[in-house]
Amino acid sequence: EVLLPVLDMFHKKFPDIRIRINNSTTPAAMNALKSGSVDFSVVTSPVEYDDEFEIVNIKDFDDVPVCGKEMAFLKERIIGIGELKEYPLISLSKGSSTYDFYSKIFAENGLKYAPDTEVATADLILPLVKNNLGIGFLPKNLVESDLESGEIFKLNLKEKISSRQICIAENKNVSLGVAASELKNM
């Protein structure tokens, strides 16, 4: 929703410029930025960073807990975070900012976050949920069509989950090239 329209505009304006896109966790993206192997990173909060980085929030989003058809009976109830532990949970892997975010939420409720399935990237969570392998937290805007079609179901939590942000991160000590600067500013 954020990146693809910008890439489309950039490609139309600069059809001869090649783009390399990496898909990784926020900590891995920040390490790539620190090492200089990427010009800038689009990451999700929470973001831990050094003073050498500038982080700009570009869009807020809300995660929602979702399940597949075999657990659809849960959608009729209001359930607490603690009740989620009775069902298999799917999460990004330990060391990701998303894992840390949910670990903190569970800890605030006196619980240990222990997902049954951990995946390397967020795009793997939805297929696992659709195939009834557990409950996952996903950005609401990314699953709206799947919710409307009845492929997956949103669970109603007692607890409020804080909004998160999509951010652009860049190294203040490194000047962006013309192409990277144009892309970032779109």
Describe each PLM feature range.
Residues 153-186:
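A late-sequence structural motif
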Residues 73-74, 88-109, 176-180, 184:
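Secondary-structure junction motif
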Residues 1-14, 18-23, 27-31, 175-178:
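N-terminal winged-helix
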Residues 44-51, 104, 122-152:
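A ligand-binding cleft/hinge motif common to bilobed small-molecule-binding domains
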Residues 6-15, 82, 99-112:
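Ligand-binding cleft/hinge of the Venus flytrap
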Residues 52-89, 93:
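Flexible hinge/capping segments at coil-to-helix
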Residues 5-9, 26-63, 67, 130-133, ...:
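Short beta-strand-centered segments that line the small-molecule binding cleft or hinge
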Residues 17-24, 44, 112-121:
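Short beta-strand-to-loop elements that line the ligand-binding cleft
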